[in-house]
């Protein structure tokens, strides 16, 4: 099965659309926009605009969360992008990180996340959600019955959704076993955020398929992918310097609450724990940070893909051979040297991307 290669962008005004157009021109299969309201613009506005500026490329949130929008609102937003893009939308979602941190919140509990996924899928299918369940997502607001209306909705659903519109697939970003299992039960796809280490990726794949089997579902009837920090550069150390902000950010997902799920040797655990303790959310995804200083060359060599184009192609092919059909590439860090970052992106687009086809 062909492997989709995606890139990640931001929904900043004017910039998001330019990034989507450039990604399509470069040959990427998909373009995902971050959802972090205090750090970037609205992703659904950016995706809708990108839908009209592009023709082929798939468009996704990368990723949204279960707390800043009701599942009906999320479903309606991405279904609108689906209609505007003629069926190219994907709903990427995780438990939340920077979007919640800037509201003073931690990621959503796994049980709440799974309930959200269940409701979200119902809305996207055009199914009904019980009003009691829909209202529960909004906390202690007074119930509709207090208004004593002559007539009220009997359930909650997207009435405007056309039956002929193809359902938007849900793609869960997952790292730990509980979230992987929840995603395996409810999503069309799981994109793992466990790094590029083959041992950790195999563990994540096995966890997902085991959860599907335990739920009575076909273990092979779900798409699997991975988020990968990739910077192509003749000098691996220079590649790490360009990528370190993103590498530290994604490494933190593997130790979000201070414990490392899945396989990791002693040195890997030491680095991950160092990233966890040093992480400064005010400098999220940036180079030159305390969290980036925790990264060692050995750790970066296994967790990320950094170095000459040929080695990047080889590593990405090895990862795809595990049965993954979607790879989302995170390139140079947000504040990396603009000229060097642009050169690295061109190197990936001109050398690595064609080499993966």
State where each predicted segment sits.
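Alpha-helix-loop-beta-strand connector modules within alpha/beta enzyme cores
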Residues: 44-64, 68, 123, 345-357
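N-terminal beta1-alpha1-beta2 module of alpha/beta enzyme domains
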Residues: 1-61, 168
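Active-site mouth loops of central-metabolism enzymes
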Residues: 2-14, 64-71, 164-175, 230-233, ...
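An alpha-helical appendage that flanks or caps ligand/catalytic pockets
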Residues: 106, 110-160, 201-321
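Glycine-rich, proline-tolerant flexible connector loops at the mouths of alpha/beta enzymes
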Residues: 30-53, 65, 196-198, 331-345
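Conserved, mostly hydrophobic/aromatic
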Residues: 27, 50, 81, 120, ...
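Short, acidic/polar
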Residues: 12-23, 77, 174-182, 309-318
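Hydrophobic faces of well-ordered beta-strands that scaffold small-molecule active sites
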Residues: 3-7, 31-33, 59-62, 89-93, ...
């Amino acid at each position: 099965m062909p492997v989709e290669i995606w890139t990640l962008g931001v929904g900043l005004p004017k910039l998001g659309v330019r990034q989507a157009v450039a990604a399509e021109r470069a040959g990427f299969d998909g373009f995902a926009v971050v959802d972090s309201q205090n750090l970037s613009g609205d992703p659904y506005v950016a995706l809708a605009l990108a839908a009209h500026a592009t023709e082929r490329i798939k468009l996704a949130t990368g990723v949204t969360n279960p707390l800043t929008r009701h599942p009906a609102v999320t479903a309606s937003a991405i279904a609108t992008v689906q209609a505007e893009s003629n069926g190219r939308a994907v709903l990427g979602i995780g438990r939340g990180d920077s979007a919640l941190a800037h509201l003073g919140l931690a990621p959503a509990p796994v049980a709440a996340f799974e309930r959200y996924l269940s409701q979200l899928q119902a809305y996207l299918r055009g199914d009904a959600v019980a009003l009691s369940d829909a209202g529960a997502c909004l906390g202690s607001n007074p119930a509709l019955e207090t208004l004593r209306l002559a007539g009220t909705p009997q359930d909650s659903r997207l009435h405007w959704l056309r039956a002929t519109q193809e359902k938007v697939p849900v793609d869960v970003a997952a790292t730990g076993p509980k979230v992987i299992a929840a995603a395996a039960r409810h999503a069309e796809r799981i994109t793992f955020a466990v790094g590029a280490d083959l041992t950790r990726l195999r563990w994540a794949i096995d966890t997902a398929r085991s959860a599907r089997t335990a739920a009575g579902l076909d273990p092979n009837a779900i798409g699997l992918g991975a988020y990968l920090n990739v910077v192509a550069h003749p000098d691996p150390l220079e590649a790490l310097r360009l990528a370190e902000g993103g590498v530290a950010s994604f490494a933190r997902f593997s130790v979000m609450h201070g414990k490392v799920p899945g396989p990791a040797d002693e040195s890997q655990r030491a680095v991950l724990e160092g990233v966890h303790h040093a992480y400064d959310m005010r400098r999220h995804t940036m180079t030159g940070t305390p969290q980036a200083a925790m990264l060692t060359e050995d750790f970066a060599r296994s967790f990320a893909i950094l170095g000459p184009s040929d080695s990047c192609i080889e590593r990405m092919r090895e990862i795809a051979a595990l049965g993954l059909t979607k790879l989302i590439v995170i390139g140079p860090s947000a504040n990396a040297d603009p000229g060097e970052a642009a050169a690295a992106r061109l190197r990936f687009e001109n050398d690595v991307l064609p080499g993966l086809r």
